[in-house]
Amino acid sequence: MRFCRNKSSLTAAVIIALLLAFALIVPLVSHNNYTKSKTDTTYLQYGKLLPKSKLFSWAGWDGAKRETISSDMYAYYEAMETERGVNAITKVYKADYEDSSSTSNSTFYDVRVDSYSKIGMLNLTLTKAEYEAIQDWQDENQIQVIYPSVDSKSIQAPNLRSDPNIWYKCTNKGAPKLDKDGNITPIYLTKGKDGDYHSLRIAGDDGSYRYATVTGSSASMSFKVRVDSLSYFQYRYGHEPIFLFGTNAYGQDILTRMAEGARFSLLFALIISAINLAIGAVYGAIEGFY
């Protein structure tokens, strides 16, 4: 009864109970193929993702944030959407305006950018078995994962040649160079071997696009490919990339990491308490005996 009348004790008990529930339940319900792959280097591709929840997306918990970007970056994101059908820009607050405080000749956009979609494409090197497995998954699920390889030699800016989202003739800042009709000009590879690609092809492909560049000997071939980061995540881990508290710089799920840390702290506290109790009991017994 005295415990129940003490508000501080009740509050502390509730907090401890919530911490226990968080530490015990969250690692169980959030345990999946992604969180249990602790040594997976693919994690690094999904670093610093923002908190996202389908249930609370209406409240701004949608994995996106407001940014001010240049017109070149805006065109870059638009080109990503043209290829993938996924727009990294979820909302435009202010479009194509000049900033008197900027030294750049560019105009700017105030937009909301999805941290998940903005990753775009990834450059991967696959084994023959991995290459075939993705193609089989594409056929089974009718979802495009592998996209055509590009002729990086036709990109003038050396720093952009390794950018997997550049699939078109571009300026030195990554913005598309449009043809006379205002269309983007693809630079997809049409020559060379791609390991007999036999799966889904993107719209507009007449069968000439190459979906990989093959390196190595016939005994140990490697396949360099461009994959869509969202659909590749689904293929590899079996679910959409959605993280309630986002991810850290290493791509680790923050919610799961927090719960595992809380569980370790509670376990450590129990061990220390048990040690203190044992030492106290022995010391007290010795003092009482003598």
Q: What do these predicted regions represent?
A:
Residues S8-V29:
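Short, strongly hydrophobic transmembrane alpha-helices
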Residues M1-R5, I25-Y250:
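Membrane-topology segments of multi-pass transport proteins
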Residues T11, I254-I286:
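Transmembrane alpha-helix signature in integral membrane proteins
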Residues F289-Y290:
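Helix-loop interface residues and adjacent transmembrane-helix termini in multi-pass membrane transporters
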Residues V14, L18-A21, T39, A269, ...:
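Residue-level signal for alpha-helical context at structural boundaries
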Residues L19, A249, E260:
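Short alpha-helical basic/polar micro-motif
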